[in-house]
């Protein structure tokens, strides 16, 4: 897992951190009198803000209730977990000005199927039910309207907020074994999972943030003048004792490495305990660790942005949400998984002016809006970022429409269990 730094290095790191904590606290106090609420000025660091209204039209299929509303009525926990964006996206589109009731003028077609709303008693989506729900929904759409069959879904988009997107499994090995459902291979997938060169991320997908309850976070706001007295903060698992007790497979060993190297380091406030003051603590921290787990993404990234805690992203090859609109390189610190043993030195070496710039950018309301699914929606929020991503794909290329006689979907392709009726 690496070696602990020698006493001289540790002392130098501690001294650098002490100076950083003092300077950042002074900046926080000064910022409360100068912060303006609006878009950041300057050439760098802005969130790309576009109004999608008038740039695209979306037709929302009216599906039988068994695909959405009945599932939600059976288990309202679906509205609270980190996969809830697929439900709120449906609600948003129903009243959005981009919605059209005339499918002939639509640029995009949306199928509201709540694949993450069939839950275990513990509140997790059932991985064997989700692909069956999706396949059944696509079959219904193809049999009821002519639009799917014109393109094999190439002008359709689907939300797939599962751990590994449209591979529909929380374990990577099983997700790769399934692969992206064959019926979705031509569709645009809007998903939380994003990792370069991975079979569960197909070209053209739109990577989005997971759902984190905006109202809950707002209820835990503290004064922005509060000193950031915590250098590094993290709460969560380091080992998945049930599935990977040694820690070598879970998070590719990165979380275990954080714990083994820094559990006794006073600069690191890290624990498996999740206190009632979790959100308040993030607002007192300079850096918040955002390591991969079973998948590279988690709601911590959203929480860190909202609370102005510089995200420390430890997830090699991650594709971040709305990367064409949010300047992640300017608001985050990226640490390679193999460099975790040097995490203290790396973070202590970030120049003070860079830390302050990242904090100033994170303080922008536009930055926070872009990662949140508000109810009701707000300009520039995650819903609008999705629409902007879809609008930027227009017009569709000529090859989107199937030629007469061109072979369409093989409805019998896929894993045997996935082909069972739902």
From Swiss-Prot:
Function description: Involved in the synthesis of glucuronoxylan hemicellulose in secondary cell walls.
InterPro entries membership: Exostosin (IPR004263), Exostosin_GT47 (IPR040911)
Residues bearing glycans: 149
Record-given protein name: Probable glucuronosyltransferase Os01g0926400
Pfam families: Exostosin_GT47
Family: Belongs to the glycosyltransferase 47 family.
Keyword Transferase recorded: yes
Membrane topology: Single-pass type II membrane protein
Transmembrane segments annotated in the record for this chain: 9-29
Cytoplasmic topological domain residue ranges: 1-8
Keywords: Cell wall biogenesis/degradation, Glycoprotein, Glycosyltransferase, Golgi apparatus, Membrane, Signal-anchor, Transferase, Transmembrane, Transmembrane helix
The enzyme's E.C. designation: 2.4.-.-
UniProt enzyme class: transferase
GO CC annotation: Golgi membrane
Subcellular compartments: Golgi apparatus membrane
Primary location class: Golgi
Gene Ontology biological process terms from the UniProt entry: cell wall organization; glucuronoxylan biosynthetic process; plant-type secondary cell wall biogenesis; protein glycosylation
Gene Ontology molecular function, alphabetical: glycosyltransferase activity
Organism, as annotated: Oryza sativa subsp. japonica (Rice)
Lumenal side: 30-422
């Amino acid at each position: 897992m690496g070696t602990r730094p020698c006493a001289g290095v540790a002392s130098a790191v501690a001294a650098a951190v002490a100076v950083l904590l003092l300077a950042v606290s002074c900046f926080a106090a000064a910022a409360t009198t100068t912060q303006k609420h609006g878009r950041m000025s300057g050439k760098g660091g802005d969130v790309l803000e576009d109004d999608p209204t008038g740039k695209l039209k979306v037709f929302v299929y009216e599906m039988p209730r068994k695909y959405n509303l009945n599932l939600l009525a059976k288990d309202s926990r679906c509205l609270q977990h980190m996969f809830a964006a697929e439900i709120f996206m449906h609600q948003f589109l129903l009243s959005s000005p981009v919605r059209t009731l005339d499918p002939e003028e639509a640029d995009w077609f949306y199928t509201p199927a709540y694949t993450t709303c069939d839950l275990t008693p513990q509140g997790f989506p059932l991985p064997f039910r989700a692909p069956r729900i999706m396949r059944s929904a696509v079959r219904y759409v193809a049999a009821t309207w002519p639009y799917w069959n014109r393109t094999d879904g190439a002008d359709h988009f689907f939300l797939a907020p599962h751990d590994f997107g449209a591979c529909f499994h929380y374990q990577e090995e099983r997700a790769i074994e399934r692969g992206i459902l064959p019926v979705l291979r031509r569709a645009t997938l809007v998903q939380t999972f994003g990792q370069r060169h991975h079979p569960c991320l197909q070209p053209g997908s739109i990577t989005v943030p997971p759902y984190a309850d905006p109202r809950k976070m707002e209820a835990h706001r503290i004064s922005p003048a509060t000193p950031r007295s915590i250098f590094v903060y993290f709460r969560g698992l380091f080992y998945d004792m049930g599935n990977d007790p040694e820690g070598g497979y879970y998070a590719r060993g990165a979380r275990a490495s954080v714990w083994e190297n820094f559990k006794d380091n006073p600069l690191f406030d890290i624990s498996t305990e999740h206190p009632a003051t979790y959100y308040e603590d993030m607002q007192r921290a300079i850096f918040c660790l955002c390591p991969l787990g079973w998948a590279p993404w988690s709601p911590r990234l959203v929480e860190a942005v909202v609370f102005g805690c510089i995200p420390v992203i430890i997830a090699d090859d991650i594709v971040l949400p709305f990367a064409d609109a949010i300047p992640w390189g300017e608001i985050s610190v990226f640490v390679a998984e193999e460099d975790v043993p040097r995490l203290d030195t790396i973070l202590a070496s970030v120049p003070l002016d860079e830390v302050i710039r990242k904090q100033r950018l994170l303080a922008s309301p536009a930055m926070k809006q872009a990662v949140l699914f508000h109810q009701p929606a707000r300009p520039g929020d995650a819903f609008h970022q999705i629409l902007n991503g879809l609008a930027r794909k227009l017009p569709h290329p000529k090859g989107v429409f199937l030629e007469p006689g061109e072979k369409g979907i093989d409805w019998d392709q896929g894993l045997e269990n996935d082909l069972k009726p739902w």
